[in-house]
Amino acid sequence: MTPAGRFAPSPSGRIHLGNILCCLLAWLSIRQKDGRVLLRIEDLDTARCPRRYSEQMLEDLHWLGLDWDEGPEVSGPQEPYYQSERTALYEAALQKLTEQDLVYPCFCTRAELHAASAPHREDGQVLYAGTCRDLTAEQIAEKSLLRAPAQRLRVPDELWSFTDGHMGFYQENLARDCGDFLLRRSDGMFAYQLAVVLDDAAMGVTEVVRGADLLDSTPRQLYLYHLLGLKAPEFIHFPLLLTADGRRLSKRNADAGLDDLRPRFSAAEILGRLAFLAGFNPDASPKTAEELLKDFSWDKLPREDIRIPDGFFADKGAV
């Protein structure tokens, strides 16, 4: 099988430096293997991801020199490449899992899920307590009169492990560390975990490059691959890009977004500085994606989060 990587951004705003680093690493990693690059737009939440944001994202990626072989504008055998247009695939998989008695309706509200008494992981994430796991048919019918349910996947009390291409060995007990997780929300929107597994498998993705914040999503996704009889890709997680004071970047951080950076820097200047922070550009000199190919190696990247020094992207002379 031809190696295939992808970048799959969510167009909820202008892309920021963290998004750019993700796309760059995915592009470099698969291009070094002479593989194909897919672009998929993860716009399941259409209210937060209007099409104009997707169009701007495509233009930004072109400007950065990060091209793709399949996806919006170039088409391909697995179109459409917008998740909002692929819901029939997700519906069929949900039905298959439901018929195996692996899915159940959940009527818990957000407030109930996040109550102080709810079980939490050490990192503060809420674990589902299994409140609706064993409802009777009568209870389900009664609760359905009051609100539409979400759909959750039953997980076993088992360890699921994998060896990440950069972070190394990782494992979780699905019941203890994850809990039964959502496949579809109560408003009908399919969950990321189901959609990403189905799309990566359908599109022949062999390598998934993404931020370390998604490392703990991998065991539950591997479980879904197993249940659905699909071949899982290799996973490579990279350290997160943080502000100087340790905050996660988001599309609300205007100083890290391309709307602020494009008027002041060339694409090569942005990529060169990001590559320097990530450890595979010996200095912060401007480099195109093509020029970075010869120096890129996963061995050069750190495993701990990367902080952007104060003023590093303030102006061209800040380095």
Regions found by a protein language model. Name each.
Residues 1-14, 32, 37, 64, ...:
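Non-catalytic terminal extensions that flank enzyme cores
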Residues 1-117, 121, 212-213, 217-230, ...:
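N-terminal Rossmann-like or analogous alpha/beta NTP/dinucleotide-binding catalytic cores
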Residues 42, 73, 237, 261-262:
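Sparse recognition of residues in long alpha-helices and their boundaries
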Residues 59, 92, 115, 134, ...:
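Charged/polar, solvent-exposed surface patches and flexible loops
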Residues 69-73, 183-187, 225-228, 239-240, ...:
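Short C-terminal domain-edge/linker segments immediately following a structured domain
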Residues 80-96, 120-126, 149-157, 277-293:
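Short secondary-structure transition/capping segments
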Residues 111-250, 257-261, 313-314, 319:
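Active-site cores that bind ATP or allylic diphosphates and position pyrophosphate for catalysis
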